[in-house]
């Protein structure tokens, strides 16, 4: 058997050292990748926090709004004042107030009424949209039939709220309702206009007929013929059966007294 030489032993040792160095380098790379992999969850935690914030924002945006109907608006109160008073209880989206002389609330007797000083702020009813329907429910149940309140000397301090929550009612439905009321108002106006025209035409026909009859009467009176009023009077006159007047004969007593007087003064 041949024994290995010193040079071959050195080469073998050099190869072993190179293998150890490459193995240590591989281990370092593996450890580095492991450290990077362990550092990634920290980033994912930030991403999870960001996603949770986005979810909360989406939840806030996804809140279903609720609408409160105010059946009576105090005189002189404007939509801006309603928004200010209702904004104390929650976030408000839209506010709509209907005027007293609006097409939806047409009053035929309003034409004869005198205009008030603050006619521009004369509203009958209002709709308030809360961004959260739970807030709308609590506000409607809490403020209904309650005094408005406020500082001493406020105009609506002693006035009372009359409101209720409209379940299942959306703001788009309000627009449809207002459009329907306007169409109904226009239809009522058209019917009233046509009725007034027919009454006016009938009146003018009667006036023209009366004029023609008067002209005929005047012509007949000028020609000397019998007027049309005479037969009408005879037709309407009534005849009653009269009894003949019977003279009563003088009594004997009356004759005797006459004879005595004649004898005395005769």
Curated annotation (Swiss-Prot):
A biological process from GO: small-subunit processome assembly
Sequence segments annotated as region (Disordered): 1-74, 215-259
Compositional bias of kind Polar residues: 22-42
Any coiled-coil regions, as ranges: none
Main location: nucleus
One GO CC term on file: nucleolus
InterPro entries with a match to the protein in the record: ABT1/Esf2 (IPR039119), ABT1/ESF2_RRM (IPR034353), Nucleotide-bd_a/b_plait_sf (IPR012677), RBD_domain_sf (IPR035979)
Domain of life, per lineage: Eukaryota
Keyword rRNA processing (UniProt): yes
Cysteine-cysteine disulfides: none
A single MF term (Gene Ontology): RNA binding
Metal-binding found in the keyword field: no
Subcellular location: Nucleus, Nucleolus
Family: Belongs to the ESF2/ABP1 family.
Function: Involved in the small subunit (SSU) processome assembly and function, and in the 18S rRNA synthesis. Required for the early cleavages at sites A0, A1 and A2.
PANTHER family referenced in this protein's UniProt entry, alphabetically: ACTIVATOR OF BASAL TRANSCRIPTION 1 (PTHR12311:SF7)
Full protein name: Pre-rRNA-processing protein ESF2
